[in-house]
């Protein structure tokens, strides 16, 4: 069990460090930065590579909504849910702390005013999208993510391609929802950066736990009900 938790901690660390790091650093230059496409690729590539790296140890969740969604889909034991989530949150916070230390070396950096890659809705949505829009986006996209994850790891699926499918799904999800909420679908990712943003991101953090978890349960339940092999 300890090896599984260490794998989840490391995987979530790399996800937050790579994905949120791309937002904090590489997307900060209007003309030279990587933009929405680059950020989307960064999140997808970190998940893809870390599933290949440690997925055989822990399953490669790196996301509390995925862990709960897999449980809802009958693919994960309830007794392991809380330990996995704790490891994921710790890994994310450690990554955000490293990002904060690096970013603090830039003259004029302020995590509060920059947003520090935090997720938000309403006035804190990158595109000014409402709470209602954010609810629909986070639930639907997390549900889709779970359906892809469970389907790609189904024993009937082509072997060896699950990390690629999952990583590309996360790229697509980010391309869709960065303008809406800055893309969460992952409470650990949202928590990690919100702690260092330390104002509005913490006030809205409840949303980025509740909605992705609902979406995860919906996605896991849909796959279990409609697509799982009959026993």
Swiss-Prot record:
Organism lineage string: Bacteria, Pseudomonadati, Pseudomonadota, Gammaproteobacteria, Enterobacterales
Record-annotated disulphide pairs: none
Site (Involved in tetramerization or stability of the tetramer): 20
Residues that span the membrane, as ranges: 9-29, 34-54, 82-102, 133-153, 160-180, 202-222
Domain of life: Bacteria
Location of this chain's protein in the cell: Cell inner membrane
Catalysis performed (reactions): H2O(in) = H2O(out)
Organism of provenance: Photorhabdus laumondii subsp. laumondii (strain DSM 15139 / CIP 105565 / TT01) (Photorhabdus luminescens subsp. laumondii)
Entry comment, domain topic: Aquaporins contain two tandem repeats each containing three membrane-spanning domains and a pore-forming loop with the signature motif Asn-Pro-Ala (NPA).
Gene Ontology MF terms in the entry: water channel activity
PROSITE patterns linked: MIP
Subunit composition and interactions: Homotetramer.
Family annotation (InterPro entries): Aquaporin-like, Aquaporin_transptr, Aquaporin_Z, MIP, MIP_CS
Family assignment from sequence similarity: Belongs to the MIP/aquaporin (TC 1.A.8) family.
PANTHER family named among the record's database cross-references: AQUAPORIN TRANSPORTER, MIP17260P
Principal subcellular localization: membrane
Sequence motif: NPA 2, positions: 186-188
Function according to Swiss-Prot or TrEMBL: Channel that permits osmotically driven movement of water in both directions. It is involved in the osmoregulation and in the maintenance of cell turgor during volume expansion in rapidly growing cells. It mediates rapid entry or exit of water in response to abrupt changes in osmolarity.
Name of protein: Aquaporin Z
UniProt short sequence motif NPA 1, positions renumbered to this chain: 63-65
């Amino acid at each position: 069990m300890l090896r599984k938790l260490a794998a989840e901690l490391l995987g979530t660390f790399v996800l937050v460090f790579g994905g949120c790091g791309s937002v904090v650093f590489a997307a900060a230059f209007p003309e030279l930065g990587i933009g929405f496409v680059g950020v989307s690729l960064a999140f997808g590539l970190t998940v893809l590579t870390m599933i290949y790296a440690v997925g055989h140890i822990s399953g490669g969740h790196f996301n509390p909504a995925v862990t709960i969604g897999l449980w809802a889909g009958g693919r994960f034991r309830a007794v392991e849910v809380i330990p996995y989530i704790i490891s994921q949150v710790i890994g994310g916070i450690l990554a955000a702390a490293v990002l904060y230390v690096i970013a603090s070396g830039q003259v004029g950096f302020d995590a509060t005013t920059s947003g520090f890659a935090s997720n938000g809705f309403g006035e804190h949505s990158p595109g000014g999208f409402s709470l209602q829009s954010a609810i629909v986006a986070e639930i639907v996209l997390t549900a889709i993510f779970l359906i892809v994850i469970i389907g790609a790891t189904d024993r009937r699926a082509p072997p060896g391609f699950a990390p690629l499918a999952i990583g590309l799904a996360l790229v697509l999800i980010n391309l869709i929802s960065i303008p809406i909420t800055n893309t969460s679908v992952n409470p650990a990712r949202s928590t990690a950066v919100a702690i260092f943003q330390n104002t509005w991101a913490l006030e809205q953090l409840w949303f980025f736990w509740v909605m992705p978890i609902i979406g995860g349960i919906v996605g896991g339940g849909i796959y279990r009900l409609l697509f799982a092999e009959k026993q």
